[in-house]
Amino acid sequence: MGLPLTFDDNNQCLLLLDSDIFTSIEAKDDIWLLNGMIIPLSPVCGDSIWRQIMVINGELAANNEGTLAYIDAAETLLLIHAITDLTNTYHIISQLESFVNQQEALKNILQEYAKV
C-alpha cells in the first residue's frame, strides 16, 4: 500500500483510501483489529439487503475473512477482521491489502442492494 502508519494515543490508525474507503487499525496487545466502513445503513431498510448481508457474513466466516457488524449508534455497516500474527511484516501488509480489497468489493456490492 505504500502508506506510513501513524498510531494516535488510543493506539488507532485511521486510513482514507481512494477518497471513499475508510479503514481503522486498532493496535491491541497481541492483535491488530481492522474496521472498515462498508455503507451507511438504516435499521429499517428492506429485507433483501439484510438477507444479502447474512449470506455474505456466512461466506466471510467460512473463509476466515472477517465479519460484518452493524453499528446501531452510527447506522453503519462495518467489516471487522483481526490480524493475529504480528511477527511477519509481509503477512501484515498482505492481510491489510486483502482487507481493503474485500472492503471495497463489499461496498460496491452492498451499495447496489441499498438502492433497491
Swiss-Prot record:
Main localization of the protein?
cytoplasm
| Gene Ontology CC annotation, any one | cytoplasm
Keywords of this protein's UniProt record, alphabetized?
Chaperone, Cytoplasm, Virulence
> Localized where?
Cytoplasm
Q: Which domain of life is it from?
A: Bacteria
- Show the stretches that span the lipid bilayer: none
The note filed under miscellaneous reads: The structure of the SptP-SicP complex contains four molecules of the chaperone SicP, aligned in a linear fashion and arranged in two sets of tightly bound homodimers that bind two SptP molecules. The SicP homodimers do not interact with each other, but are held together by a molecular interface formed between two SptP molecules. The chaperone-binding domain of SptP does not adopt a globular fold for interaction with SicP. Each SptP molecule is wrapped around by three SicP chaperones (two chaperones from one homodimer and a third one from the opposite homodimer pair).
Describe the task this protein carries out.
Molecular chaperone required for SptP stabilization and secretion.
* The family this protein is said to belong to: Belongs to the SicP family.
Alphabetized NCBIfam families for the sequence: PRK15329.1
Protein name, per record: Chaperone protein SicP
Q: Which organism is it from?
A: Salmonella typhimurium (strain LT2 / SGSC1412 / ATCC 700720)
Q: Coding gene?
A: sicP
